[in-house]
């Protein structure tokens, strides 16, 4: 005699998923479907964007280091003149610092060219002016460090992110920006390890030195510096080819390609609108403890589904 309990299967699994999604919502977690909870439970790799996820995304200028005989206030004034056109939190920090110092600027530059995930390029008094990442200023634009100032450049503080300002092909200033790590960042990394995630990766547009310092501080397994938006998505594709399940956590426009490429993309609620739209799961901005809750809820869901399956099928074996 064979008894058909397929109706029990058809009922128990959707109910378990809906119950898990409802439980997640009580912790301010928005999940767009049960398969994303399954992906979180099965994931063996978590990829974090640094700015806005592991940090508070409230950067402030810590110091301005002039090069090539430039004056500190003048290079900050010039940087703010360009950065006010750039929709990025670090750019806003530069503009805010110039305003705090009373450095009001006139629009002396020509048309501004905004290069996504790189920086800003324009022309002032017939000279090309660029500001942005190390890769953009030195590799893409070919700027050089002034002679005899290499040692000064090498001594840049590692604990800060850096914006590089080049004028006429020569480095004119480095703006050091502090964006403090979330207090719970190290605890979250440790907690995810204990919950069975073997590989935690950080990606950032910051320099190698800054990325290394952050990774060592919070105990991240792998880190990649000076990455572009396409680099994050390409990394996830390579992990998929290696048979790994990948979760991506990000909050910015630049994270959107990687969020859509991951098995489940997680966005911060107060991040960029496009990141929230692309992401499969949204967490609150107050802290990262929701990640540990999400992992526990996902694991509990999969245990419940497997337990129900065994019990229902077991009736047919009796």
Residue locations for each model-derived region?
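Conserved switch/coupling elements of ABC/ABC-like ATPase nucleotide-binding domains
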Residues: 54, 273-274
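Conserved phosphate-coupling serine/threonine residues in phosphotransfer and NTP-handling enzymes
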Residues: 6, 13, 203-206, 270
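Hydrophobic transmembrane alpha-helices
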Residues: 1-8, 249, 265-272, 281-285, ...
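Cytosolic catalytic headpiece
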Residues: 32-254, 258-264, 296-299
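Re-entrant/interfacial helical elements at transmembrane boundaries that shape
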Residues: 1, 13-22, 60-63, 93-98, ...
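Hydrophobic alpha-helical transmembrane segments
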Residues: 1-48, 192, 215, 221-225, ...
